Amino acid sequence: MKIRNTILSLTALAGFTASGQMLDPAKLLQKPIDTWPTYNGDYSGQRFSQLKQINSGNVHGLSLAWVTRFGSGPGVTIKSTPLLVNGVLYFTAPNNVWAADAHNGRELWHYQYPPNTGSTIGNRGVGMYGNWLFFESPDSNLVSLDAKTGKERWKVQMTDPKLDYTSTVAPIVVGNHVILGIGGDHMDNPGFIESRDPETGNLQWKAYTTPRKGEPGLDTWPDEYASAHGTGQTWMPGTYDPQLNLYYVGTGNPNPVLAEQSRKGDNLYTCTILALDVNTGKKVWYYQVSPHEVHDWDASETPVLIDGVIDGKPRKLLAQASRNGYYFLLDRTNGEHLVTTPFIDTLNWAKGLNAKGQPIGDPAKFPRPDGVLVSPASNGATNWPAPSFDPETGLLYVGASKSYSMFYVTDTDDHPEGWAGLDASAGTQGAALEAIDYKTGKIVWQHEWPSGGGPSHMLSTAGKLLFTGNANNFIAFDPANGKILWHAGLTGPVTAGPITYELEGKQYLVLASADSLFAFTINQPVK
């Protein structure tokens, strides 16, 4: 296999020069057109493209351009948003990185990470700096590859292997910083965000997501031991404001996950949106969306950056539809709370909001030995699948789930560990694609999925189109009113965020489903 891949790489890449593979850093600061250079297309997290060659007037002519299967073993699922740089797609599955020709889907090279004991739940993709790619392995190594050949440049261990951390994050490259996150809350390990040098992999800074001794926030835990084992993992990439030089990232749930008796208090900085100085990792502000969270919901969903208008004044905003079922709108310069409102009507775990707009958890809905019925379910009202914001409609598009779980505590010890409980699905009132007014949190329209299902991935464009998927279709909606304009059948669900790009004058849409990439375009001449 290695010999075959090497020959394939050399043959397929003969027409590519090293300079041709280099990512122009300026592309990261622009709305994507002929590139998709970072996880969300640009730093804002909006997943909005200025392209409009494919538009509401001609989307009915969209057809399959190519499909390629990239299998590397049973059960492989591509959960990574592909990057597109200079005509090459880069994408991942756990332990695997591929490069493919964006014209036709032909594999250019395939890097396979050695067998390891890390979790293979998923991998969100690569980051890129110049000619180099970066991805996190399941056993928490940062690996750097040559983008032209797929050859490994170096790898560095991010954590002590004995601690059994896991890694799923797509690195985000900001200047000369490769910003990383971590997973593994089941092992009681402290969460962190860190930055490494793209040249060497050396650590530049590390910001823990639970407070150390002498740090602010420790008083929200019973003691230093509880905080040190409180996790707050950072398993999704964040967003970035280049004017403020702030990186925004959501943190995971506290630990023990379902048993709260050993961690009384708000448990900072779990289930929190953090704003970090990119140069130092210093916490500039924070907002906790779920104080003292007890249902395995996190705040890891994309913090979407919006330059909007509130009460007639321009504001730099941050919007998040969070896993706990609430929509939050903040001032991203200082964390000031502006809006909190539920985006599912089955939500039953909170008694109301406090003065800061934070939900007040109802102790009657905490997990207990005989179980308690709660909505949203353990997977949340939404989850990691990417939302999208269309600045032309002013709507945030989110996949929403109106489901229930029974939550149980199974470890009533004074100091439980790990999950310390279990949850079981307890039915659903359906799932929907929701269009949320960013200013108010009001649901402007929604499309109920007839077969139920859960949140899917979003992409909006200046062509007055919104793309997403359900259990086995790729679908285009009118973003203003939710009318279905086009759809194509797939062999399964959309498993990663769709992207769009222009290549040699033609616009393409690319999406992942299971172990394959599908590309769509309009093959007849575009008027």
What are the roles of these predicted feature ranges?
Residues 191-202, 266-281, 334-335, 431-438:
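Beta-propeller blade signature
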Residues 401-402, 425-483:
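Loop/turn-rich, solvent-exposed surfaces of beta-rich toroidal or solenoidal domains
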